[in-house]
UniProtKB/Swiss-Prot annotation:
Its main location: cytoplasm. The keyword Chaperone applies. InterPro entries: UreF (IPR002639), UreF_sf (IPR038277). Belongs to the UreF family. Required for maturation of urease via the functional incorporation of the urease nickel metallocenter. It is found in: Cytoplasm. The gene is ureF. One of its GO terms (cellular component) is cytoplasm. Keywords: Chaperone, Cytoplasm, Nickel insertion. One of its GO terms (molecular function) is nickel cation binding. This is Urease accessory protein UreF.
Length: 231
């Protein structure tokens, strides 16, 4: 296996950083509803909820990300757009649709500023022309393909980003501390390789994310009264 260079490592770290300006801090991925409903109430239940969200995401966002990365490596815009559409059709929650499209467009615009690539430019134009939704995982796949970074790294960064977003939101809404949230992240990070191997052979037709409690919380989120920035 080719050793990753220091520059490649730093690229991976940069795009996995919570300070990446794509708006992730504005979302909780339904954690607000889970707190209101009592599904999450301490560090243990928080860890279980984040793990369930990450596992569901592997079979949906993760599959779309891998498909987009592979299509981008072939310079196949139609394949990228197909991954985008397939994911949007399966992300039925209002918050999740808003989250993935808002963050996706911002990531695409950032990618064009940092490391412009023709295919990324075509994807962003398709978003602006309302031809494609512009889902965040698809943008991540495009970005990493353009940087010639492997799909496994893109998958891991996306997986980490979701978990980091949720525990960051938890710190603002419930009684947990940084030791709790870092322990959760450490445990979930240890599972990402298995999650990648589980879905690496999936095609777009295999995308699935059966997690009924999580889906109910996503649907309930629109009416939730718990908010991250409540004062």
């Amino acid at each position: 296996m080719k050793a990753i260079s220091a520059t490649e490592l730093l690229r991976v770290l940069q795009f996995g950083d919570s300070t990446l300006p794509v708006g992730a801090f504005s979302f909780s991925n339904s954690l607000e509803s889970a707190l209101q409903a009592g599904e999450v109430h301490d560090a243990n239940t928080l860890g279980q909820y984040v793990r369930a969200a990450c596992r569901q995401t592997s079979g949906l966002d993760g599959v779309a990300l891998l498909a987009a990365h592979r299509a981008a490596c072939r310079q196949d815009l139609d394949g990228v757009l197909a991954a985008d559409e397939a994911l949007m059709l399966r992300r039925v929650g209002e918050e999740q649709q808003l989250m993935t499209t808002r963050m996706g467009k911002k990531l695409g615009e950032l990618a064009l500023r940092l490391c412009p690539a023709p295919l990324t430019g075509e994807w962003v134009k398709a978003i602006n022309d309302n031809v494609t939704p512009g889902c965040f995982p698809v943008g991540m796949g495009l970005l990493f393909a353009g940087l010639e970074l492997p799909e496994r790294d893109a998958f891991a960064v996306h997986h980490y980003g979701l978990a980091s977003m949720m525990v960051g939101a938890a710190l603002r809404m419930m009684r947990v501390d940084h030791y709790d949230t870092q322990s959760i992240l450490f445990a979930i990070n240890g599972e990402v390789e298995d999650e990648y191997l589980r879905v690496a052979g999936f095609g777009l037709g295999d995308m699935a994310g059966f997690a009924p409690v999580f889906d109910v919380m996503v649907a309930h989120h629109v009416e939730s009264h718990v908010r991250m920035f409540m004062n």
